[in-house]
């Protein structure tokens, strides 16, 4: 058992943000991020949109979000983890529509760049699982954390890549904000985080509240960034152990 794992197991998650933390890059694969929002001032290091499998650079600061979803997700990460540096990879187009091909391309970019935490507040259908799985496994072996949302309404599966063993899948539960976790063993998605009426930044300015697994997922990504900032040698399987150990046991 590593010293980092033991220290992380003993840590108080609610006070980690007060430590001197190493900066951790967190990729947000979503509808884009409004990096000009005050809640994200100075927190977004790069912005791209992925179209037809190709990345296109976008000016920072600026509004790369055509829907508002990704800005909300990024603001949750930024609020909880002061050491998180947001890497914006827009895979969804206006109306929150996107293609599995663009999602796979964006994940490939994040994995190749070895971004330590990859937040995916979305779920692809099973037909894209064969393309997503090897990328998630490569990330795992490169000591990157892929954190992905469970479907809000499961339809035969919980969504991909959340179902993969190499990924930290996240559901939603009625829990105190912001770093409470629920651990339910023997489920395909063992971790839940708060996901009801989460205060988030709105693209274009102002604030709103959002509900869903999409907004529970960045809470877990933020905790991963905090833990990696405090204990940089934590490995993905250690991270899962720590998250589950800190969770209230359910089921």
Range-by-range predicted roles:
Residues 2-84, 200, 204:
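Active-site core segment of subtilase-fold serine proteases
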Residues 16-21, 79, 98-119, 129-145, ...:
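Mature extracellular/periplasmic domains of secretome proteins
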Residues 33-34, 94-95, 123-127, 152-155, ...:
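Solvent-exposed loop/turn segments at secondary-structure junctions
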Residues 59-127, 231, 243-247:
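Subtilisin-like peptidase catalytic core
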Residues 60-71, 153, 208-220:
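Gly/Ser-rich catalytic serine loop of serine hydrolases
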Residues 87, 145-147, 169, 199:
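Structural detector of well-ordered beta-strand residues that form the stable sheet scaffold
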Residues 159-229, 233, 237:
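Extracellular S/T/G-rich loop segment that most often corresponds to the catalytic His/Ser-adjacent loop
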